Amino acid sequence: MCAARLAAAAAQSVYAFSARPLTGGEPVSLGSLRGKILLIENVASLUGTTVRDYTQMNELQRRLGPRGLVVLGFPCNQFGHQENAKNEEILNSLKYVRPGGGFEPNFMLFEKCEVNGAGAHPLFAFLREALPAPSDDATALMTDPKLITWSPVCRNDVAWNFEKFLVGPDGVPLRRYSRRFQTIDIEPDIEALLSQGPSCA
């Protein structure tokens, strides 16, 4: 069993994990976000839904961030090589290419990582184990096997860019959404969690 899967198996919540910010510096412990509602997405700057999903991620962070939502983006190049920029190039790609028009993410972006296979970031190994399939499409799979570039291949693999994981204020993953489920449409689920008040976690 690889290190990522061992870490995932031992974890009880996302608070066991950390990730390095896209702009560099010390890793951010997700434990520092205890009590917040987290929306975690694997992102890519050259995907057909980049404009839609990035702008909707910004919108949710803008509207619901003051009430306790934290949006986290993890660039990944495993799906059609649609995040082939270097870490230091991604923000400029977003600003000038897609979405373009001076776009700047107002949510936390982390360094590029893998979400599937032996090299998967331990956070995503944990999320996939906790939520094996998207709630809106339990049969979601990679649509073109020729594009699978990782090993081993598992039934709970992330199928494409912009899969979403909603995590409660106790750090426990609650719901997974497919790439086809629009980010903005998660708002009612987030609102339901926010209305429950602060967690004792």
Swiss-Prot record:
<feature type="modified residue" description="N6-acetyllysine; alternate">
    <location>
        <position position="112"/>
    </location>
</feature>
<dbReference type="GO" id="GO:0019369">
    <property type="term" value="P:arachidonate metabolic process"/>
</dbReference>
<feature type="modified residue" description="N6-succinyllysine; alternate">
    <location>
        <position position="86"/>
    </location>
</feature>
<dbReference type="GO" id="GO:0005829">
    <property type="term" value="C:cytosol"/>
</dbReference>
<dbReference type="GO" id="GO:0005739">
    <property type="term" value="C:mitochondrion"/>
</dbReference>
<keyword id="KW-0712">Selenocysteine</keyword>
<dbReference type="GO" id="GO:0006749">
    <property type="term" value="P:glutathione metabolic process"/>
</dbReference>
<dbReference type="InterPro" id="IPR036249">
    <property type="entry name" value="Thioredoxin-like_sf"/>
</dbReference>
<dbReference type="GO" id="GO:0019372">
    <property type="term" value="P:lipoxygenase pathway"/>
</dbReference>
<dbReference type="InterPro" id="IPR000889">
    <property type="entry name" value="Glutathione_peroxidase"/>
</dbReference>
<feature type="site" description="Subject to oxidation and hydroselenide loss to dehydroalanine">
    <location>
        <position position="47"/>
    </location>
</feature>
<keyword id="KW-0007">Acetylation</keyword>
<feature type="modified residue" description="N6-acetyllysine; alternate">
    <location>
        <position position="146"/>
    </location>
</feature>
<feature type="modified residue" description="Phosphoserine">
    <location>
        <position position="199"/>
    </location>
</feature>
<feature type="modified residue" description="Phosphoserine">
    <location>
        <position position="32"/>
    </location>
</feature>
<keyword id="KW-0575">Peroxidase</keyword>
<feature type="modified residue" description="N6-succinyllysine; alternate">
    <location>
        <position position="146"/>
    </location>
</feature>
<feature type="modified residue" description="N6-succinyllysine; alternate">
    <location>
        <position position="112"/>
    </location>
</feature>
<comment type="subunit">
    <text>Homotetramer. Interacts with MIEN1.</text>
</comment>
<dbReference type="GO" id="GO:0047066">
    <property type="term" value="F:phospholipid-hydroperoxide glutathione peroxidase activity"/>
</dbReference>
<dbReference type="GO" id="GO:0042744">
    <property type="term" value="P:hydrogen peroxide catabolic process"/>
</dbReference>
<dbReference type="GO" id="GO:0010269">
    <property type="term" value="P:response to selenium ion"/>
</dbReference>
<feature type="active site">
    <location>
        <position position="47"/>
    </location>
</feature>
<keyword id="KW-0560">Oxidoreductase</keyword>
<feature type="modified residue" description="N6-acetyllysine; alternate">
    <location>
        <position position="86"/>
    </location>
</feature>
<comment type="similarity">
    <text>Belongs to the glutathione peroxidase family.</text>
</comment>
<comment type="function">
    <text>Protects the hemoglobin in erythrocytes from oxidative breakdown. In platelets, plays a crucial role of glutathione peroxidase in the arachidonic acid metabolism.</text>
</comment>
<dbReference type="GO" id="GO:0004602">
    <property type="term" value="F:glutathione peroxidase activity"/>
</dbReference>
<protein>
    <recommendedName>
        <fullName>Glutathione peroxidase 1</fullName>
        <ecNumber>1.11.1.9</ecNumber>
    </recommendedName>
</protein>
<keyword id="KW-0597">Phosphoprotein</keyword>
<keyword id="KW-0963">Cytoplasm</keyword>
<keyword id="KW-0443">Lipid metabolism</keyword>
<dbReference type="InterPro" id="IPR029760">
    <property type="entry name" value="GPX_CS"/>
</dbReference>
<dbReference type="Pfam" id="PF00255">
    <property type="entry name" value="GSHPx"/>
</dbReference>
<feature type="modified residue" description="Phosphoserine">
    <location>
        <position position="195"/>
    </location>
</feature>
<dbReference type="GO" id="GO:0042542">
    <property type="term" value="P:response to hydrogen peroxide"/>
</dbReference>
<dbReference type="InterPro" id="IPR029759">
    <property type="entry name" value="GPX_AS"/>
</dbReference>
